[in-house]
Amino acid sequence: ASYEALGGFVRNWPGKRIGVIGGPGDRRDEDFVSLGELAADIFDEIIIKEDDDTRGRPRGNAAELIYQGVEQFLNQGKDFDSRVIYESILDETSAINMALDRAPFDSLVVILPESVSRAIGLIEARNPVKDLELSESNLKSSKSSEELKTSIVH
């Protein structure tokens, strides 16, 4: 349900939509297949990664199931953009970096990370919001400086 809610937002993005997707290894096989189907319906480009901790699954198995779901959706013949690009890059850091490298100016990159702090670090290392300054006047015009800071981080 949470992925479908995310999809409602992402589908309306006017630029390129790139997803770095994966999930914890202790999920059911059909959950991974469903994630792949949903991703194929949402994104223009999909990079399938796996968590470092596969939670008992053989390395590559969860990604294989997600890949299967992407292919199942694309082979259904529904009304979709046949130019969906998808691939597996199992290492989360490599997958995130590849998505960020490929993202044009107006794109949206959605990352479903195992390690949120690692993902944020990779994004921050690229200085994506160079010109944004939190000046005193910006903070004073806001109801709350904490609200403003939170909205910029999220």
Functional labels for PLM-detected ranges:
Residues 1-154:
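ATP-dependent carboxylate-amine ligase
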